[in-house]
């Protein structure tokens, strides 16, 4: 059975890594729909809502909304509460590219408010090398649904045996999360 053609939504000017990731996943970069931005360089919520409705009418499957915390070009933060509300209403995955702007969650006011609602995302990517001087290859992807994350990556082939203790001990193996 063929999978439906998917759509991923992100603001114009969002990081190019999204298109690259979709290429790696086999969806191709053509599934990206760039949404116009408002005067604060945030994804325009009316345009996003209209794009999702239009794509559904055309038989496409909205897969994800990619919010941005600190866009590379202008440092913009999307309205994460509005994105999360729409994602929940439409049953669409909400991811936040917080590679550059995750730090604001740790900051004092007024910078902390830039990332209000970011915790409602289904997943968040961050790169610590962009702020605290950590090595370039240090990054993380946080997934809100532990069970979904585990079931996606968990694999117990016959040659991997459980043990009472040690690295293979217990129910949770390091490899069960990717």
For each feature predicted by the language model, list its residue ranges:
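Active-site C-terminal subdomain of aminotransferase-like
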Residues: 71, 116-178
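Active-site-proximal loop/turn and secondary-structure-junction residues that shape catalytic pockets
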Residues: 14, 71, 98-102, 130
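Short helix/loop capping segments that flank catalytic or ligand/cofactor-binding pockets
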Residues: 18-20, 31, 75, 103-104, ...
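Soluble FAD-dependent oxygen oxidases
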Residues: 62-74, 87, 92, 164, ...
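Catalytic PLP-binding core of fold-type I/II PLP enzymes
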Residues: 76-108
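PLP-dependent aminotransferase-class I/II
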Residues: 1-67, 74-78, 82, 108-113
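Acidic/histidine-rich catalytic neighborhood
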Residues: 100-101, 106-123
């Amino acid at each position: 059975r063929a999978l439906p053609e998917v759509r991923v939504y992100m603001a114009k000017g969002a990081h190019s890594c999204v298109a690259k990731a979709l290429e790696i996943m086999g969806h191709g970069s053509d599934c990206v729909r760039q949404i116009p931005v408002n005067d604060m360089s945030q994804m325009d919520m009316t345009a996003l809502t209209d794009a999702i409705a239009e794509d559904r009418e055309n038989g496409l499957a909205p897969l994800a909304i990619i919010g941005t915390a600190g866009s590379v070009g202008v440092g913009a933060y999307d309205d994460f509460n509005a994105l999360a509300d729409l994602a929940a209403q439409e049953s669409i995955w909400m991811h936040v590219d917080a590679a550059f702007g995750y730090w604001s969650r740790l900051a004092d006011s007024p910078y902390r408010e830039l990332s209000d609602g970011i915790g409602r995302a289904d997943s968040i990517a961050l790169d610590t090398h962009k702020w605290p001087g950590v090595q370039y290859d240090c990054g993380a992807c946080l997934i809100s649904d532990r069970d979904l994350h585990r079931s996606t990556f968990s694999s117990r082939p016959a040659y991997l045996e459980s043990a009472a203790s040690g690295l293979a001990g217990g129910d949770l193996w390091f490899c069960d999360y990717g």
